[in-house]
Amino acid sequence: MNFLLTWIHWGLAALLYFHNAKVLQAAPAQGDGDRQQSEVIPFMTVYERSVCRPIETMVDIFQDYPDEVEYILKPPCVALMRCGGCCNDEALECVPTELYNVTMEIMKLKPYQSQHIHPMSFQQHSKCECRPKKETRIIQEKKSKREKGKGQKRKRKRGRYKPQNFHCEPCSERRKHLYKQDPLTCKCSCKFTDSRCKSKQLELNERTCRCEKPRR
């Protein structure tokens, strides 16, 4: 009789244990989600993450290799260390001051023709600084020259020069490297010519500005 009661006792204990384990496994972890949603990131952490520094950035390969338009590249983008972040003055921009190259293997495909893995070199940034923007430097240089008093005629000539292209809308958000733009008229045209495409046994698609395989 005692033996039977002992087995019943252990059986009930085992059932209770497995039942509680399933309940705990099915229930969401209380506190973790609430803590993440209500967490306030400290100011210094936010500030340190925003400063100008090299950060991992996904870069379109065609941005660095615009002449490879006849190929399909896989992957089409790569992770590189590039300068990013904020500067405390709108007249400054985050630019690289130290560079180095890294070589990566990229697959190059020609539809219905061939495919091969090819080493390609990419530039990475190891050090960044906040420095005056290009248009800011132009304004500062013109102001410095005017202060030296080179004559009213030369002042007027310098004053007429403005970097017009800063007001032009980009030709294409995704494929800027395939277009060239007139800084005065903002007119867009294909960077590659039909003769260049034909030299590679391709033809120019004027809509996409890419060298493509001739249609039959």
Curated annotation (Swiss-Prot):
One molecular function GO term is:
heparin binding
Q: Where is the composition biased (Basic residues)?
A: 145-161
GO CC annotation: extracellular space; membrane
**InterPro entries to which the protein is assigned, alphabetical:** Cystine-knot_cytokine, PD_growth_factor_CS, PDGF/VEGF_dom, PDGF/VEGF_growth_factor, VEGF_C, VEGF_C_sf
For this chain, the annotated S-S bridges are 52-94, 83-128, 87-130
Position of the signal peptide: 1-26
CDD domains, per the entry: PDGF
Q: In which tissues is it expressed?
A: Expressed in venom gland, heart, brain, liver, skeletal muscle and kidney.
Cell compartments where the protein resides: Secreted
What GO biological process terms are annotated to this protein in UniProt? Answer: cell differentiation; induction of positive chemotaxis; positive regulation of angiogenesis; positive regulation of cell division; positive regulation of endothelial cell proliferation; positive regulation of focal adhesion assembly; positive regulation of mast cell chemotaxis; positive regulation of peptidyl-tyrosine phosphorylation
Query: Which residues, by range, are in coiled-coil regions?
Result: none
Q: What Pfam families does the annotation carry?
A: PDGF, VEGF_C
Q: Keyword annotations for this protein?
A: Angiogenesis, Developmental protein, Differentiation, Disulfide bond, Glycoprotein, Growth factor, Heparin-binding, Mitogen, Secreted, Signal
Q: Which family does it belong to?
A: Belongs to the PDGF/VEGF growth factor family.
Q: Give a short account of what the protein does.
A: Growth factor active in angiogenesis, vasculogenesis and endothelial cell growth. Induces endothelial cell proliferation, promotes cell migration, inhibits apoptosis and induces permeabilization of blood vessels.
The name of this protein is Vascular endothelial growth factor A
